């Protein structure tokens, strides 16, 4: 271990269903957060909201998925929404404002409040599938 605290990664209920349906692995989500922590953020939308690309299973990022993540560097990342680039070009102004407001609220939660959300199955913790074999 390098002594750095590990980023806690979560996905909300909607995103968990989306990822399952689209075959997006937890390993891919962990990789996206690791890239963000390294400064490789695809789009910083402000207010703790970032857009990260995630590759399709067996494909590259360019034809893959766009994910919206509530993000606090090296502390917390919560996958909130995802879409295929072929399905949606970008967020409109109302959607962007709504997600920024949600990011502000969710990132302000204490760890105890996050733990409650996990117990109530409104959030699901993401673990690296490859490291848990």
Where are the model-predicted features located?
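Arg/Lys-rich, positively charged N-terminal/basic patches that mediate binding to nucleic acids
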Residues: 1-24, 116-133
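Preference for short coil/turn "hinge" residues that link or interrupt alpha-helices
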Residues: 2-3, 17, 34-38, 76, ...
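Enriched for short, Lys/Arg-rich terminal
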Residues: 70-124, 129
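Polybasic/polar functional segments that serve as interface/processing modules
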Residues: 1, 28-33, 56-58, 97-100
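Charged, alpha-helix-enriched surfaces in structured cytosolic catalytic cores
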Residues: 10, 24, 63, 75, ...
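Generic detection of intrinsically disordered/low-complexity segments and helix-coil linkers/edges
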Residues: 4, 8-12, 59, 77, ...
